[in-house]
Amino acid sequence: MTLDEIHTLAWNKGEGLLPAIVQHAITGRVLMLGYMNQDALRETLASGRVVFFSRSRQQLWTKGETSGHFLDVVDVSTDCDADTILVLADPLGPTCHKGTESCFTDAVATDAQRLAFLALRENIITHRISAQPESSYTAR
């Protein structure tokens, strides 16, 4: 996702807000769900840190601004309907305000889910090798 693509999302479906799922970039574990407006997404892309729109305070907030447990952005994409945002992030500490890695503490990950990131990484490397072999670090 780039800054130029922000306006192409389906902002009208959620009254200017879209759900933003934050997923651990390495393990694939879902860390939290927040909401973004266009300004929050713009700030997320520009700063490299996850920024949400607080529905209760009606303002932007950077995840980790009080705790120091920021979510560093690895990648941002959307679903097929452009009405949900997926943020792959590197958490700098617990994500949940209750001190747990994920806000979804009751979720039980299977061995397959824990290792799914390996298949994803393999696909990324394979794609990069075939896309630009002359400039690909992985193709050397």
Each language-model region and where it sits:
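Flexible "arm" and connector segments at domain edges
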Residues: 1-140
